Design a protein with these regions (language model features):
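Residue-level preference for beta-strand/loop junctions
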Residues: 16-18, 43, 93-95
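Conserved Nudix-box catalytic region and its N-terminal flanking loop in Nudix hydrolases
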Residues: 31-71
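Acidic, metal-coordinating catalytic segment for phosphate/diphosphate chemistry
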Residues: 1-23, 158-159
Length: 163
């Protein structure tokens, strides 16, 4: 073990900070709800599962419920929200993404229709896409996570090995 010096102490005292993204994996009959990004300045026109950033002192479940209401316009039951996948972005972007899901029998009877954008305007429209046939124009790290989730993996890294 190397002795502690002023240089190593200073280097290790700077804490790494992550941006935490919360995505919704809303799956119905093998189809995933994806939104087309709009008015965000990043990836506009590309598809991804509805998402938002984790707020200070907010739990992942609270964030998922908030994102569902704000982005999609639906109410999720916090007791039914579960963790489906985690993606660690090691590209240098400093991001960790948690993908949460809920049983979607409520969506089929709740009067919500794909295509309706939520109140925040981060998405221009929504649609249901087969997990086995995702749109070509999709945010890369979201595609990696969704493919791994569909294959049964609970964790992935981005960029994925071989990308």
């Amino acid at each position: 073990m190397q002795p502690l010096t002023a240089e190593t102490t200073a280097r290790h005292s700077r804490h790494f900070q992550l941006i935490v993204d919360v995505h919704l994996l809303l799956v119905r009959n093998g189809d995933l709800l994806l939104g087309r990004r709009a008015n965000t300045g990043y990836g506009d026109g590309a598809y991804e599962p509805p998402s938002g950033r984790l707020a200070e002192r907010e739990t992942l479940v609270e964030a998922a419920v908030r994102v569902a209401a704000a982005q999609v316009g639906i109410a999720l039951d916090p007791a039914r929200v579960t963790l489906a996948h985690v993606l660690h972005d090691v590209s240098g972007a400093g991001r960790m993404a948690f993908f949460l899901t809920e049983d979607l029998d409520l969506l089929t009877t709740g009067g919500w229709a794909a295509g309706a954008a939520g109140p925040t305007g981060s998405y221009s429209d929504f649609g249901w896409y087969p997990l086995t046939d995702l749109p070509a124009n999709m945010i890369d790290r979201a595609r990696v996570a969704v493919r791994n989730y569909a294959a049964g993996a609970r964790f992935s890294t981005y960029p994925a090995f071989g990308m």
